[in-house]
Every structure is written in structure tokens, then in C-alpha cells.
């Protein structure tokens, strides 16, 4: 159920204008990596009752902000993992969506790369655009 929620929140973030364009690449390249990160994290909690309290946030951020969803402890409210997507625009190379995550271990400072998906030479719409 946690992994289904991760997928649902991702497509909510993409909105109806971005999702159809990147859906196949996302499901093939990025989503399996997100699922592995979450599964590996949960495996570290198997002997801990905190495992039961791990949930996914239910509202991605719209506009140009990066948040897709957070994995957090519903009892303490503490974020454990944060999954983000950033719009990159390398010179003369069109627009890319860079998927990455942050962990509580380092105070969410380091970017852990999941991969990038090419958009187009034209500016992508805002997140959650209909």
C-alpha cells in the first residue's frame, strides 16, 4: 500500500499535462528506484514497532517547487525520506526532470540521485497543471 501511495502521489504531482509525456519513462526508470529506496528503508525497521507508523504524505507541492512526497512517521510527525523532482535546463539541452531524494540521516542535505527524464526544448508546465 505504501508503494501504491508513492505512485499515486507522483502522478498527482505531474498533473494531466506532464504525466502523459513522461509516464512510461517514469514507470520504467524512476519508480522502481523509488520503490527500492522505500523497501530498503523499511527493511531496516522490521524489528521495530516504528515500521507500522511509516506513511507517505498526501499532498505534493504545485507550481515550480520540488516536493513529490515525504515518507514520515505518523506518530512523531518526523520526516524520514523526502522525494523531490527538479526542473533542470542545461544550456542548449532542453528541459529535464531530475528525480532525487533526501534522508533524515544527514538532515536532508545530500541529493541522492534517482535519474532524469527529458521533457522537451520548450518550458514544461507547472506541476499539477490540468
Model-derived segments and their meaning:
Residues 117-129:
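Short, low-complexity, Pro/Ser/Thr/Gly-rich segments in the mature regions of secreted, periplasmic
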Residues 79-82, 114, 118:
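Local beta-strand/beta-hairpin segments that build beta-sheet-rich folds
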Residues 20-92:
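Mature extracytoplasmic domains of secretory-pathway proteins
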Residues 95-112:
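Histidine-centered catalytic micro-motifs
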Residues 87, 101-103, 119-121:
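Short, solvent-exposed aromatic-acidic interface loops
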Residues 5-25:
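Acidic/histidine-rich, surface-exposed loop or edge segments in extracytoplasmic proteins
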Amino acid at each position: 500500500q505504501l508503494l501504491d501511495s508513492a505512485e499515486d502521489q507522483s502522478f498527482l504531482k505531474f498533473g494531466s499535462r506532464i504525466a502523459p509525456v513522461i509516464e512510461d519513462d517514469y514507470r520504467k526508470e524512476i519508480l522502481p528506484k523509488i520503490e527500492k529506496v522505500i523497501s530498503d528503508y523499511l527493511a531496516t525497521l522490521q524489528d521495530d514497532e516504528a515500521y507500522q507508523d511509516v506513511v507517505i504524505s498526501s499532498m505534493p507541492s504545485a507550481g515550480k517547487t520540488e516536493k513529490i512526497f515525504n515518507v514520515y512517521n505518523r506518530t512523531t510527525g518526523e520526516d524520514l525520506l523526502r522525494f523531490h523532482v527538479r526542473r533542470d535546463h542545461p544550456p542548449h539541452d532542453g528541459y529535464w526532470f531530475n528525480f532525487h531524494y533526501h534522508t533524515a540521516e544527514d538532515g536532508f542535505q545530500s541529493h541522492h540521485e534517482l535519474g532524469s527524464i527529458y521533457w522537451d526544448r520548450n518550458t514544461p508546465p507547472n506541476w499539477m497543471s490540468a
